[in-house]
């Protein structure tokens, strides 16, 4: 009976170690996924910011052209 317990105990211990390693790997993958999501958010916000800055610049240029036209009365 004692000779059967040793292999069974070994199998249980190896299973626990394997499960622990899988959980650690899964946690690492989840952290990596969160980092990727943050990078996507940053790139998306950067793109939106660049678009808004470009739109603001073009709007300011058109307003300045209109004002200079009215001030110089060249319209």
Curated annotation (Swiss-Prot):
One GO location term (cellular component): extracellular region
Disulfide-bonded cysteines: 69-75
Prosequence residues removed at maturation: 23-40
InterPro entries: Antimicrobial_frog_2, Frog_antimicrobial_propeptide
Coiled-coil residue spans: none
GO process terms (BP): defense response to fungus; defense response to Gram-negative bacterium; defense response to Gram-positive bacterium; killing of cells of another organism
Cell compartments where the protein resides: Secreted
Residues annotated as signal peptide: 1-22
Subcellular location, principal: secreted
Entry keyword set: Amphibian defense peptide, Antibiotic, Antimicrobial, Cleavage on pair of basic residues, Cytolysis, Disulfide bond, Fungicide, Hemolysis, Secreted, Signal
Expressed in which tissues: Expressed by the skin glands.
KW Cytoplasm (keyword) present: no
Protein purpose: Has antimicrobial activity against some Gram-positive bacteria and fungi but has no activity against a range of Gram-negative bacteria except P.faecalis. Has antimicrobial activity against the Gram-positive bacteria S.aureus ATCC 25923 (MIC=19 uM), B.licheniformis X39 (MIC=37.5 uM) and R.rhodochrous X15 (MIC=9.5 uM), is virtually inactive against E.faecium 091299 (MIC=150 uM) and S.carnosus KHS (MIC=150 uM) and inactive against E.faecalis 981. Active against the Gram-negative bacterium P.faecalis X29 (MIC=9.5 uM) and is inactive against E.coli, P.aeruginosa and S.typhi.
Family: Belongs to the frog skin active peptide (FSAP) family. Brevinin subfamily.
Protein name: Brevinin-2HS2B
Protein species of origin: Odorrana hainanensis (Odor frog)
